C-alpha cells in the first residue's frame, strides 16, 4: 500500500506498508482472495483517514492492528482473519 496522509500542519506524507493477513485455514485465504478488492479499498480508507502522526505512533500500533482485522472481517462471511502482520511500515 501507498497511502497519502496529512500531518497536523496539512503537509502531505506517504505511508508505504506491506502486510500479511493471518488466517486459520485455506478456505479463509480463498474467501479473502474473493473479496480482495473491497478489503484493500476498506484498508486504504481506514489508513487514509488517520493523521500521519497517528500512523507513526507506536503506542497506537496494536489498536490499528485490531481495527484493521475488524475491517477485514467485515467483508468476510464464512471465515475470519485472526491477525495482521506488518512486513514493512515506512512513513515518508
Question: Model segments located where?
Answer:
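N-terminal, polar/charged subdomain of small-to-medium soluble alpha/beta proteins
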Residues: 1-46, 55-58, 62-66, 70, ...
Amino acid at each position: 500500500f501507498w497511502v497519502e496522509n496529512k500531518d497536523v500542519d496539512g503537509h502531505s506524507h506517504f505511508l508505504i506498508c506491506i502486510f500479511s493477513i493471518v488466517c486459520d485455514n485455506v478456505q479463509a485465504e480463498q474467501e479473502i482472495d474473493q473479496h480482495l478488492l473491497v478489503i484493500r479499498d476498506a484498508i486504504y480508507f481506514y489508513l487514509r483517514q488517520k493523521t500521519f502522526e497517528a500512523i507513526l505512533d507506536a503506542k497506537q500500533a496494536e489498536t490499528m492492528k485490531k481495527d484493521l482485522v475488524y475491517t477485514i472481517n467485515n467483508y468476510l462471511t464464512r471465515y475470519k482473519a485472526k491477525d495482521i502482520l506488518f512486513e514493512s511500515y515506512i512513513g515518508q
